[in-house]
Amino acid sequence: PHHTMAQKIKNIKLYKNDLPLNVTFKGSIAIDTETMGLNINNDRLCLVQISDKEGNSHIVQFIKDCYDAPNLRKILEDKNILKIFHYARFDIAVIKKNLGIMCESIYCTKIASKLARTFTDRHGLKDLCKDLLKIDINKQNQTSDWGHDSLTESQLEYAANDVIYLHEIKNKLDKIIKREGKEYLAQACFKFLPTRAEFDLLGWQEKDIFQHK
């Protein structure tokens, strides 16, 4: 099956292997991925979740070795659409490894939080939802078999939760970043992310090329 809508619960739509042509986005989207594990070179991409500003979630489920997704790739490469991630470094590396393209126009809420909220070391998505939005999200499906052919309703809701709050989090963080005069630093970090992801794919995750040693 190819990009047929398999399920729809609440504002969540699930497709197989690609987005359909009639799903389009403008301005900005929130994106996350789910993989078999956390090794970007060995653990395959299972899901790509996309949410628009209205909180509608579109989830693309990849059957193993079926990564020909021209509609999704076109959106990810579109420089006119801002992609909001939480920990973009991992997601864009996984997308490059599996879909063969590098995302353009990137924003990372984890980096933004580290720049804006220097008074805390709590920069996880659950922390940002709780601290900035007063929302307690459920992370019980964080370790889950995302490669299974049929996903549970709770898995789909978990996957959607990873993207539906990112627009609002970005808006909150941007206000602090602007107030503290760190906009140029944030933009420089976001622009460097594709390069950082390329280093990770080369096996340099733990190596800092800027260090003296």
Question: Which residues fall in each region the model found?
Answer:
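Generic structural signal for hydrophobic core residues of well-folded globular domains
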Residues: S51, K79, L115-A116, L132, ...
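A polyampholytic, Gly/Pro-enriched intrinsically disordered region
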Residues: H123-I137
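Acidic, Mg2+-coordinating catalytic module of metal-dependent nucleases/exonucleases
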Residues: D136-E198
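Glycine-rich, flexible loop/turn motifs
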Residues: M102-C103, I111, L133, Q142, ...
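Conserved RNase H-like, two-metal-ion catalytic cores of nucleic-acid enzymes
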Residues: M5-D127
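Acidic, Ser/Thr-rich low-complexity intrinsically disordered segments
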Residues: E198-K213
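A broadly conserved amphipathic alpha-helix scaffold signal in soluble, globular proteins
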Residues: A93, K126-K130, I164-N171
